[in-house]
């Protein structure tokens, strides 16, 4: 997604499409490791932390990311466009790829290309077999672009991390900000 040192945003969308259409690079056969001693990292018990009651933690790693992607594109994702916004249905209907994209275990290009391949497969299905898949893949593809659009906006205008994007919002709520609510 992000293109560094753009002089302006004109043509960003076309550049994004061009980048996403390129083939995924092959992984290197080996990486040179760094020989460095590491200090002991304490575990939860040593830090006197309670065990985490969350039973549905996602598995990390590349294989888990690829499995989630495939499962979303072929099973869970059919209701995506209608179910992504509800806390009741989103867990099962969304891709759950955010952590994998953030940590780089899958790339935006991989996800985009896989989505496009799935869109083509769906297009070739008989009409009665398509279900809600065309809408789901269109919505998901749009969200991928939207994600990259806003990352690009942050790259081009880093001030928006701390300032309002539009100056008309300056002063709108500063006088009613409550530190206690924010910290909660």
For the regions a language model picked out, list residue spans one by one.
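Aromatic-anchored, charged helix-turn/loop surface patch used as a conserved interaction hotspot
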Residues: 142-143, 147-184
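Active-site "lid/cap" and pocket-lining segments within catalytic core domains
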Residues: 1-141, 151
């Amino acid at each position: 997604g992000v293109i560094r040192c753009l002089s302006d945003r004109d043509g960003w969308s076309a550049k994004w499409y061009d980048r996403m259409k390129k083939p995924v690079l092959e992984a290197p056969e080996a990486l040179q490791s760094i020989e460095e001693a590491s200090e002991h990292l304490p575990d939860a018990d040593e830090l006197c932390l309670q065990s985490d009651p969350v039973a549905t933690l996602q598995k990390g790693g590349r294989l888990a990311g690829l499995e989630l992607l495939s499962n979303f594109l072929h099973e869970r994702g059919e209701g995506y466009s209608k179910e992504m916004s509800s806390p009741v249905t989103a867990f099962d209907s969304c891709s759950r790829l955010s952590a994998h994209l953030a940590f780089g275990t899958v790339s935006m290009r991989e996800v985009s290309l896989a989505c496009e391949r799935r869109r083509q497969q769906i297009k070739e299905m008989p009409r009665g077999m398509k279900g809600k898949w065309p809408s789901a893949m269109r919505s998901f593809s749009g969200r991928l672009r939207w994600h990259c659009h806003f990352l690009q906006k942050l790259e081009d205008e880093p001030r928006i991390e701390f300032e309002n994007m539009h100056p008309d919002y300056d002063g709108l709520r500063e006088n009613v900000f409550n530190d206690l609510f924010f910290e909660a």
